[in-house]
UniProtKB/Swiss-Prot annotation:
PANTHER family: PROTEIN YCGL (PTHR38109:SF1)
Protein name per the record: YcgL domain-containing protein plu2139
Transmembrane segments: none
One Pfam family cited in the UniProt record for this chain: YcgL
Limits of the YcgL domain: 1-85
């Protein structure tokens, strides 16, 4: 399975995986609007990989088959102040 990966010009560390390069036909219009004009990053073979840097490869494969795309968003930013206050309360 080969897929194309695009980065978002609007959202840092946000990537869109699609089945074929420049084919966004299965990506919802609202998602494309909030994502911005996709910036081509690379083509990769998922068959040759056991893992991906920022996504669960099995979830990516399933999403590509079922939906035709996968959206990778960055993990939430940890609120260090809340973590510190939680530790202080203990």
């Amino acid at each position: 399975m080969i897929c194309a990966i695009y980065s978002s010009p609007k959202r840092e560390q946000t990537y869109l995986y699609v089945e074929k390069r420049d084919n966004f036909s299965r990506v919802p219009e609202e998602l494309l609007k909030s994502f911005g004009q996709p910036q081509y990053t690379m083509m990769i073979s998922l068959a040759d990989r056991k893992k991906l840097a920022g996504a669960d490869i099995e979830k990516v494969k399933i999403s590509l088959i079922e939906q035709g795309f996968y959206l990778q968003i960055p993990p939430p930013v940890e609120n260090l102040m809340n973590a510190h206050l939680s530790q202080m309360e203990k």
